[in-house]
Amino acid sequence: MNLLDQQTLINLLHQEADVAIGCTEPVMVALAAAKTRDMLGTLPRLVDISVSSAVWKNARRVGLPGTGEKGLAMAAAMGLLAPVEAGQRLLAALTPVQVEQAKILVREGVVKVGVVAAKEGLYARAVARSNQHEAIVELNGSHKNFSALWLDGRMAGGAGENLNLKLEALLAQDYQSLLKQVLSLSPEELYFLYQGAEDILTFAREIHQGGRNPLSAMASFFRRTESGGESLEVLIRNLTGIAVAERMAGATYPVLTCAGSGNQGILAAVSLLLAGQELRAGPESVTRALAIAHFTNMYLKAYTGKLSPLCGAVTGGAGVAAAICWLLEGSCQQIINAMQIVLGNLCCVICDGAKESCALKISTAAVEAVRAGYMACQGINLEAGTGIVGKKLEDTMELVRKVYQGGLGEIDYYLGKVDYLLSTN
């Protein structure tokens, strides 16, 4: 068993827990477009964007920060006008005038978008042409690291794919070994998780308490629902629902991602800060719980892929369940049992793309994760052979991987054609 050293674990955590504004798939496309303009040194006359079915599915109906707009063409057009050095915050770096310029670029047909059916998971490619030059940018396996750059047919850099630490490296050890390593990490190096979580919760509370008007009707619903004297579960449901609905509607607030996902970052942050308050856990304990949730999610995604037909609320929820159980002083086996309960409960929830109704899935997963943590600490577990649940956590995840990569391997393609399928009925 080859254990990763502590510094590699910290590097992996920082890679996957990064601040983003807006859904990370449109951000990925915007970064590709921004990099092409940076390479050309001028605004291109034409940009061709190609993405995997999974990226298309996730990016086609989600709100773009501060614009009221949706779609990959608009995301790419915004990227052409945004500073690439802003990283995953670039969509919020545009002025209102630049947003209007981006709309003009879309109307004039400067940006073309297509799907590469042969590509899976996280993949985006931008080909931009000026009057004199052509720039090509690829991102593969990462929302933010450029895997290849070409200028006028010559390699101009990249190799970000090689620099990108792979989640699969976590599978060199079993989950129990990973958990021990995570708990041995210095809380000082993990504290950024706590700070990021506090920022998310502060934003959600502002809307919940009426200090900020929501963009999303769904967020308004969560604000109105049982707005006084909520139980822990109801409060977690409402605040996760508010934060996700607002983010998907295009709110310009920064979110610390979890395994590259902002919504899963919200799931971990809100659930564990509120549970920590309920249990009177100190900042260090909550920080460690957040680290457990993040690394657990990464471990499970090493089986399924970061962007797959499996809804991220499932693995993210399992991570929260593990962390809740740890806060309740559960044993390692009980922590695994909590994860198995979530997987047995939610494993058939599919990802049908990023949109405001993700708030329903995330808020449901948050409540079920908290329940699973408490259930496991009370001695409840799912027996092996109960549905998809295996004897060991790793057995369960191998079966989940087979179901989603084999049996449901083409589902992203069909879900990406939802508009077409609806129009033919």
Curated annotation (Swiss-Prot):
**Family recorded in the similarity comment:** Belongs to the UPF0597 family.
Q: What is this protein called?
A: UPF0597 protein Moth_1414
Species assigned in the record: Moorella thermoacetica (strain ATCC 39073 / JCM 9320)
GO process annotations (BP): L-cysteine catabolic process to pyruvate
InterPro entries in UniProt: Ser_deHydtase-like_asu, UPF0597
GO molecular function terms attached to this record: L-cysteine desulfhydrase activity
